[in-house]
Amino acid sequence: MILAFQLSVFALVAISFLLVVGVPVVLASPDGWSTSKNAVFSGASLWIALVFLVGVLNSFIS
């Protein structure tokens, strides 16, 4: 269970870093938003799911 928690926290940190770097790049590029809108929304949805997963797994660990 601890390994699943650690992997989910690592995934959350990695996705957060990618979104922090990637979203401004997409928004700054010409015609970037219309071509990468689905990727940004997918990343944000994955981030929200990981936040809830980390919260649930944390309740089992603590």
From Swiss-Prot:
Assembly behavior = PSII is composed of 1 copy each of membrane proteins PsbA, PsbB, PsbC, PsbD, PsbE, PsbF, PsbH, PsbI, PsbJ, PsbK, PsbL, PsbM, PsbT, PsbY, PsbZ, Psb30/Ycf12, at least 3 peripheral proteins of the oxygen-evolving complex and a large number of cofactors. It forms dimeric complexes.
Q: What broad class describes the main subcellular location of this protein?
A: plastid
Classify the protein's membrane topology as the record does: Multi-pass membrane protein
Q: Which domain of life is it from?
A: Eukaryota
Give yes or no: UniProt keyword Plastid: yes
Organism listed in the record: Chaetosphaeridium globosum (Charophycean green alga)
Q: Which Pfam family, any one of them, does this sequence belong to?
A: Ycf9
Can you tell me which family this protein belongs to?
Belongs to the PsbZ family.
Query: What Gene Ontology biological process does one annotation of this record name?
Result: photosystem II stabilization
Keyword rRNA-binding present in the record's keywords: the answer is no
Where does it localize? Plastid, Chloroplast thylakoid membrane
Q: Which PANTHER family match?
A: PHOTOSYSTEM II REACTION CENTER PROTEIN Z
Q: Which residues form a coiled coil?
A: none
Q: What InterPro entries does this protein's entry cite?
A: PSII_PsbZ, PSII_PsbZ_sf
For this protein, the parts annotated as crossing the membrane are 8-28, 41-61
Key words of the record: Chloroplast, Membrane, Photosynthesis, Photosystem II, Plastid, Reaction center, Thylakoid, Transmembrane, Transmembrane helix
The gene is: psbZ
Specify the protein name.
Answer: Photosystem II reaction center protein Z
Write out the GO cellular component annotations. chloroplast thylakoid membrane; photosystem II reaction center
The lineage is: Eukaryota, Viridiplantae, Streptophyta, Coleochaetophyceae, Coleochaetales
Function comment:
May control the interaction of photosystem II (PSII) cores with the light-harvesting antenna, regulates electron flow through the 2 photosystem reaction centers. PSII is a light-driven water plastoquinone oxidoreductase, using light energy to abstract electrons from H(2)O, generating a proton gradient subsequently used for ATP formation.
